[in-house]
A protein has these predicted regions:
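Iron-sulfur-associated redox domains of electron-transfer enzymes in respiratory
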Residues: 1-183
Length: 183
């Protein structure tokens, strides 16, 4: 199938399903100079995002770049990269952060929408609570060692080799909310 045929099929599907489809976006959006630094099929990705989300029910931002801007948004940000939610402000945006994001979180969010016709409950960062509602610390297999006060002092000491808690060597599990400890 040619690119033109694929683009035409996408346009037909969006027209036939106005207000019923979701758009899944990967990557931050270049905005400087009208988005000219990121293009596909002769259009800027900025314009494509605006076009495909115009009649969408919701948008799912997949990955840390799409959800929060990621590394491309870091200073000096030569392309004016922003997260999807900076562009799409007129409909719900679900953020599934991670680099890479957890595949089950993506599939679970889409399946929830298809099954129930609505988006799942979201946390204060727009992430699905089902996948981002618990801290890694709460579900970590090293948690029993934390509770007993058994901490590795370096990554190559006896405690680390025995699976002790890594909190004292920089683990951010207690303040990181994600399902990666269980998936």
């Amino acid at each position: 199938v040619s690119g033109e045929a694929a683009e035409a099929a996408m346009a037909q599907a969006m027209e036939a399903n106005k207000g019923k489809y979701i758009v899944v976006v990967d990557g931050s959006v270049s905005t400087l100079d009208d988005g000219v630094y990121s293009t596909n099929a002769g259009k800027t990705n900025l314009q494509t995002l605006k076009d495909v989300t115009a009649n969408a029910a919701a948008v799912v931002s997949v990955g840390s770049c799409a959800a929060f801007g990621g590394v491309p948004q870091a200073n000096p940000n030569p392309t004016g990269a922003v997260p999807v939610s900076d562009i799409v402000t007129d409909r719900p945006v679900v953020n599934i952060s991670g680099c890479p994001p957890i595949p089950e979180a993506i599939a679970g969010t889409v399946a929830y929408f298809v099954t129930f016709g609505k988006l799942p409950d979201l946390d204060h960062l727009g992430r699905p609570k089902a996948f981002f509602g618990d801290s890694i610390h709460d579900r970590c297999y090293r948690r029993p060692f934390y509770d007993k006060g058994l901490f590795a002092k370096s990554f190559d000491d006896e405690g680390a080799r025995n699976g002790w808690c890594l909190y004292e060597v920089g683990c951010k599990g207690p303040v990181t909310y994600n399902a990666c400890a269980t998936m």
